[in-house]
């Protein structure tokens, strides 16, 4: 993914008015995984926040971000059901669920992106369902972490890890093959 993709993703994170420390750390780890350094991350964050600095209200901020999503779509020459666009889509959905609440505003932007990139609605819904399942599995694992170690607990935890791996494989296949 390029810096323009990451600006779009950071705008998505800023939709709620601020980017949480957890969201920022996830964002940074994704950029680093893609080969960017701390200076690149700061540049993207600074540029992104300057775009929405003029927002007077939540609705105004959402309108500014929506406009940037539209502009991204117009500037993007890679329209269509490509691995690149599916990767950006999954990143948006995954980060949308990262705070355990995928808001209606986040969902609207995800669907706008998918529509503008000519990605099918059923494809988006499948990704959203997989993200919900991953979130549920993660929450179950966190609950089990709070329990005392036992054979039954460990067996359930192992089953959840297998389910999680299976869901990650499903997403990888969805992104690669469409």
What does each of the following model-derived ranges do?
Residues 1-178:
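Small-residue-enriched hydrophobic alpha-helices in membranes
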